């Protein structure tokens, strides 16, 4: 069987997969990398500023969790709505729209006068952040050649770690500098507006999405343009390419996208993939955000570190967990497969959680490393579980479950800490991670090297 016939996007998808890596691929990855950095900045900075806000607004532990979870509530809705929308109006438009929504409300949150205002603005900013995840993952996976997709998507996820380091640095210098320093930290989220003209100029619409919508002429023109830029000339004449693409591409009538498409996620062909993606996102999000976002408070309140020392320790952990986990798991997933790599990350995260409780100190670095590797694998694996016409909807649906987990995790952990301390938090994490490993074994399909 030819590559074109095996590729769900037909000959145009096969031509994309056949392209050697070029400057254009790196530009695409860099723009999406900036997007994930900018749109995750707000998710990270509030917990870092929280020790000061607690003192100024006299917040109780449960209210701390509520405020930390605010953007996650917006993430749940944003992932669902914008995930569906990206399959209806396209990846590029939603990329721009989510960036604007996030940046505007992130800027406004810096001017919040009280708990209620900050909560509402954080929820609104979360709408944009939740919407970016489906479109960003779809963009990178749909333009990455199959043989490099694991590494490319994992590198895209490094933006989460890089921005964590930058957010910690900004918080270290700005938050203690003045009583209003935390406002400057939150307000820096407005820099996302600078990315909008870059997206408009640098990124084309997804070829695979266009093919799934039957817009073969536009898709063929983009592939010709990319081949001309990377190879020097198109590999096929336009008329012949369009004719062959029409013959090999799936019919747009073969499945619906948008609201009607959500039912297809639980049809006989996709239900296992959908349930698995939901479980993976819930486990990864709860255990990652539930622990990592509480790390500054654990270090300062549970372990007695002073504020500056707690920031430094958080910074070291973030540096260790930035870059190398995504690079290693991305390479491993292209070598030994997605399922095995994800399962290994989950198992190691559970083990080192208990090691951290017993030994403390720098064992937290291993904990952060494997949690970051697990988070990166959700970005690699999820887009490959869904067909082109439903990829945004599928990612949005699964990530909304993850965002719900990240919404309840800080509040749940606040209650668990009060009842069982740090050990209780890490024990619950270990149970959830064991469930994730079981789901990978029972429901997981290996997607390494598959055409999408």
Feature names for model-found ranges:
Residues 1-452:
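Transmembrane-helix signature of 12-pass secondary carriers
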């Amino acid at each position: 069987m030819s590559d074109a016939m095996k590729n769900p996007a037909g000959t145009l998808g096969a031509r994309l997969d056949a392209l050697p890596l070029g400057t254009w691929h790196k530009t695409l990855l860099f723009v999406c990398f900036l997007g994930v950095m900018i749109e995750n900045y707000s998710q990270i900075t509030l917990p870092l500023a929280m020790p000061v806000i607690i003192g100024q607004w006299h917040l109780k532990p449960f209210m701390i969790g509520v405020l930390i979870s605010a953007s996650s509530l917006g993430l749940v809705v944003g992932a669902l709505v914008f995930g569906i929308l990206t399959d209806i109006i396209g990846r590029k438009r939603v990329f721009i729209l989510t960036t604007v929504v996030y940046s505007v409300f992130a800027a406004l949150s810096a001017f919040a006068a009280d708990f209620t205002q900050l909560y509402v603005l954080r929820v609104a900013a979360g709408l944009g952040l939740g919407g970016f995840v489906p479109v960003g993952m779809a963009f990178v996976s749909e333009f990455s050649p199959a043989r490099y997709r694991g590494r490319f998507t994992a590198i895209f996820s490094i933006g989460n770690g890089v921005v964590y380091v930058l957010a910690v640095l900004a918080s270290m210098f700005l938050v203690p500098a003045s009583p209003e320093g935390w406002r400057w930290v939150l307000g820096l989220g407005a820099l996302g507006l600078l990315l909008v003209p870059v997206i408009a100029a640098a990124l084309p619409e997804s070829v695979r999405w266009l093919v799934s919508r039957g817009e073969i002429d536009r898709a063929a023109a983009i592939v010709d343009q990319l081949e001309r830029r990377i190879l020097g000339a198109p590999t096929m004449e336009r008329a012949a390419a369009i004719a062959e693409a029409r013959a090999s591409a799936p019919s747009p009538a073969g499945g619906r996208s948008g609201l009607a498409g959500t039912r297809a996620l639980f049809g006989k062909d996709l239900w296992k993939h959908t349930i698995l993606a939901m479980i993976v996102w819930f486990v990864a999000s709860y255990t990652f955000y539930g622990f990592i976002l509480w790390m500054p408070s654990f270090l300062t309140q549970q372990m007695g570190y002073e504020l500056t020392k707690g920031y430094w320790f958080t910074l070291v952990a973030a540096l260790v967990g930035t870059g190398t986990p995504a690079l290693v798991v991305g390479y491993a997933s292209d070598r030994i497969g997605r399922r095995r790599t994800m399962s290994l990350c989950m198992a190691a995260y559970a083990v080192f959680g208990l090691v951290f409780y017993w030994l403390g100190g720098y064992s937290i670095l291993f904990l952060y490393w494997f949690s970051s590797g697990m988070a990166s694998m959700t970005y690699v694996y999820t887009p490959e579980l869904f067909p082109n016409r439903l990829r945004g909807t599928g990612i949005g649906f699964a990530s909304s479950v993850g965002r719900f987990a990240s919404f309840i995790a800080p509040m749940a952990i606040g209650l668990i800490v009060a009842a069982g301390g740090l050990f209780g938090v890490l024990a619950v994490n270990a149970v959830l991670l064991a469930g994730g490993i079981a789901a990978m074994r029972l429901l997981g399909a290996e997607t390494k090297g598959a055409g999408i």
